[in-house]
């Protein structure tokens, strides 16, 4: 009878434990939730994610991990992942710095300094992970033939701390990059406004010159200049609408517009000079002929005056 009661009690307790285990589902690790928040798909973040996944695998300290830790396989893999991450991060940072050109120098310098410090912290964290694994390999090789259980426990504890610090610094870097990107977007918008303000007077000046000189050179030239001015204004409006996303393209188009304005102004000046030369060639012969006729008339008048002034001979002797 006691055996039966004992069997029933064990069965009851086992059923209760099974219900408790089914009711409590494991929640994802806080680190995994935080990692998912800052990974937005940028190339440097994807590279850092590969480094992170490899570090999680190393932290399991499985038999395969322990075998590869005794060689240089793990450190070589980590080095390659570190280099890839820093390369992608540097490229992304350079891209943002190019977009920050219209921003004030003081603001750009401050953002660059903060981002550089955050990037250095992340690189130092990754370097600490690699250095700790190299140290572990040396310690294990020194204790060859002895128990390394204590070394593995210390390594596991240290790797957990390094992972937390790495995740914290990666999150900080991602936030600073977001601020950096917001500054670049704001600078691009300011740059568009500044470009429009600078080009507006140039376009208007070109239109006025075309109207003034074209009235001398002829009506067709004026019509061509006005049509070109209309096309230029339409082109500038089209460029202004797309500048926010393609600031580099706007810079190239600005240079092209300025070159066209200078070329058109030069052509107008040359046409005005040619017109002036034609006018001069028309009137110079007429002026010279008038001068010759005037000189001949003066000579005739002088001759006539001289003849009338001569003395008349007397008849008395």
Swiss-Prot record:
As stated in the Swiss-Prot or TrEMBL entry, residues carrying the post-translational modification Phosphoserine are: 147
Q: Which Gene3D superfamilies match?
A: Apolipoprotein
Q: Which residues carry this modification: Methionine sulfoxide?
A: 143
sequence repeats, residue ranges: 80-101, 102-123, 124-145, 146-167, 168-189, 190-211, 212-233, 234-255
Annotated segments matching region Homooligomerization:
266-317
Q: Where is this region: 8 X 22 AA approximate tandem repeats?
A: 80-255
- Coiled-coil blocks: none
Q: Where is the signal peptide?
A: 1-18
Does the keyword Protein transport feature in the UniProt annotation? no
**Keyword terms of this UniProt record:** Chylomicron, Endosome, Extracellular matrix, Glycoprotein, HDL, Heparin-binding, Lipid transport, Lipid-binding, Oxidation, Phosphoprotein, Repeat, Secreted, Signal, Transport, VLDL
The entry lists its GO molecular-function terms as: amyloid-beta binding; cholesterol transfer activity; heparan sulfate proteoglycan binding; heparin binding; identical protein binding; low-density lipoprotein particle receptor binding; phosphatidylcholine-sterol O-acyltransferase activator activity; phospholipid binding
Ranges for region Lipid-binding and lipoprotein association: 210-290
* Entry's localization field: Secreted; Secreted, Extracellular space; Secreted, Extracellular space, Extracellular matrix; Extracellular vesicle
According to the record's subunit comment, the protein's assembly and interactions are: Homotetramer. May interact with ABCA1; functionally associated with ABCA1 in the biogenesis of HDLs. May interact with APP/A4 amyloid-beta peptide; the interaction is extremely stable in vitro but its physiological significance is unclear. May interact with MAPT. May interact with MAP2. In the cerebrospinal fluid, interacts with secreted SORL1. Interacts with PMEL; this allows the loading of PMEL luminal fragment on ILVs to induce fibril nucleation.
Give the family from UniProt. Belongs to the apolipoprotein A1/A4/E family.
Q: What is this protein called?
A: Apolipoprotein E
The species this protein was found in: Hylobates lar (Lar gibbon)
Q: What is the lineage of its organism?
A: Eukaryota, Metazoa, Chordata, Craniata, Vertebrata
